[in-house]
Curated annotation (Swiss-Prot):
Enzyme Commission no: 3.2.1.49
Cofactor binding mode and count: Binds 1 NAD(+) per subunit. The NAD(+) cannot dissociate.
Domain of life according to the entry: Bacteria
Protein's recorded name: Alpha-N-acetylgalactosaminidase
Endpoints of the signal sequence: 1-30
Disulfide bonds: none
Organism: Tannerella forsythia (Bacteroides forsythus)
Gene from which this protein is expressed: nagA
Function statement: Glycosidase that has specific alpha-N-acetylgalactosaminidase activity.
Length: 468
């Protein structure tokens, strides 16, 4: 059935929501593990004579606007076209672009396949996709097949194992470079910790923990007022809601797994050289009961609220353990339905020491006092990554503490110099596959499931490439 946003959103208001689900099958593990078939691709040159890189954007919500800030904040870029089916975000984005005193881009809107017209009509050096999750793969695949040399896709890049293979196969077949826009990999403390890992301070890597631990209850029932904790807001999800609540909440209704793993696993994967001398071998996942979203609805709207009748399938806390080829283990947690402060819960541990994000702790054997934590800030000042020390002033003006700017700068550097992307199709697939695999494992009572080798054996010889 055609994957349309309209059909997806209609599920939200249907009686007895929750029966749909996004199935994960064994066929996903094997049937798609074949080299991508030749794809028809328009050959479009990278860069015009004026030296400006040509960008297109699909999806014009708040993430798009932050990306536009950084694209236009870096010299040598222009926006050719933008696309969205909703007028409101388009108008906001056009006003946002106008602040930069640059030509207005061409606008594509109307039908849900309008992005295909944009891709076929315009020439781009890069297209950035910041749409609802279920559209990431169809749009990225369409962009690569249309001959766009570089495609940036927001997180998570894919929802199922099949979709992960689609990204890999089409990227390989077309030669287009896919980059997953995982901004946390560029967080300042994360990059400093990565440098410490690479310089051997923690010894041989043994274990990592991470997760997306973020109270999203207001995000999932957002009417545009309630999200900001103002009085008078209403619980909203589905077509009448605001921003992500239009589509994101439905994933909590129909799915049960780690549906948003990349903020945590991306940085840990870089520390473990995943896809570059190491790889994920297997995964097992378990989910708790689901209580948080129902309780939130009852607390805010009463026991008779229509949403109180919805069965939210997503366990409040989903815990996954991954085994790596080189022996390491990783624990990944998804926790978005309960009251809590934000944390990605990083722990990077080796034979000589570790970093723990919560508490800002570092311990290095032989340099730290025995059995006493050091403040991580003291270490991170010494091991600040060169991207941050070079771009700090510009980055501080950007979103998410500057990591969005650093990420876009690194991506644009690859585009302009026609290099492989910092976080490629194999990273996008391996990190995002946790979603589909965790759903499979939970459905089987926590059974161990094998991780596909999206590199088809290349991981043995591939060298680390991120933020060298």
């Amino acid at each position: 059935m055609e994957n349309t946003r309209r059909n997806f959103l209609k599920k939200v208001t249907a009686a007895g929501i929750g029966a749909a689900g996004l199935a994960v099958t064994d066929q996903a593990m094997a049937a798609v593990n074949q080299p991508g078939e030749a794809a028809q691709q328009k050959k479009k040159p990278a860069g015009k004579s004026d030296g400006m890189l040509r960008f297109g954007f699909i999806g014009t919500g708040s993430r798009c606007q932050e990306h536009i800030n950084n694209v236009l904040g870096i010299q040598g870029n222009k926006i050719v076209a933008i696309c969205d089916i909703q007028k409101g975000p388009l108008e906001k984005t056009l006003k946002h672009i106008a602040k930069f005193n640059v030509p207005e881009p061409k606008v594509y809107t109307g039908g849900e396949r309008e992005f295909e017209k944009m891709l076929n009509n315009e020439e781009f050096d890069c297209v950035i996709i910041a749409s609802p999750w279920e559209w990431h793969v169809p749009m990225a695949v369409a962009a690569m097949k249309a001959g766009v040399p570089y495609v940036g896709v927001e997180v998570s890049a894919a929802n199922t194992v099949e979709e992960c293979w689609d990204l890999v196969n089409v990227s390989e077949a077309t030669g287009s470079h896919l980059n997953i826009l995982e901004n946390v990999c560029y967080r300042r403390d994360v990059m400093a910790a990565l440098r410490m890992v690479r310089e051997g301070l923690f010894g041989e890597m043994i274990h990592g923990t991470c997760g997306y631990q973020h109270d999203l209850r207001d995000v999932k029932f957002n009417d545009g007022i309630h999200y900001t904790y103002q009085e008078g807001g209403e619980l909203r999800m589905g077509p009448t809601a605001y921003a992500e609540a239009q589509w994101r909440t439905q994933h909590s209704v129909t799915r049960n797994g780690d549906i948003y793993p990349t903020h945590g696993i991306g940085p840990v994967a870089n520390c473990l050289n995943i896809n570059r001398g190491n790889r994920f071998l297997s995964l097992t996942s378990m989910a708790t009961q689901s209580r948080g979203l129902h309780n939130f609805v009852v607390d805010k709207g009463g026991a008779n609220h229509p949403y109180a009748k919805i069965h939210f399938n997503l366990g409040d806390i989903v815990t996954s353990m991954i085994k790596c080829a080189n022996g390491q283990t990783v624990i990944v947690t998804h926790d978005t339905n309960l009251p809590r402060p934000y944390s990605l819960g990083f722990r990077i541990q080796g034979t000589r020491g570790l970093w723990m994000n919560d508490g800002n702790h570092v311990y290095v054997e032989g340099q730290s006092k025995p059995h006493r934590w050091d403040a991580s800030d003291d270490w991170f000042k010494k091991y600040d990554h060169k991207l941050w020390s070079t771009l700090e002033l510009k980055a501080k003006e950007a979103g998410h503490g500057g990591m969005d700017y650093i990420m876009m700068y690194d991506f644009i550097d690859a585009i302009r110099n026609k290099k492989p992307t910092p976080m490629d199709c194999y990273d996008a697939a391996a990190w995002s596959a946790i979603s589909g695999l965790s759903e499979m494992s939970i459905a089987r009572g926590g059974a161990v499931v094998d991780f596909p080798d999206f590199t088809r054996g290349q991981w043995i010889h591939r060298q680390p490439a991120f933020a060298l």
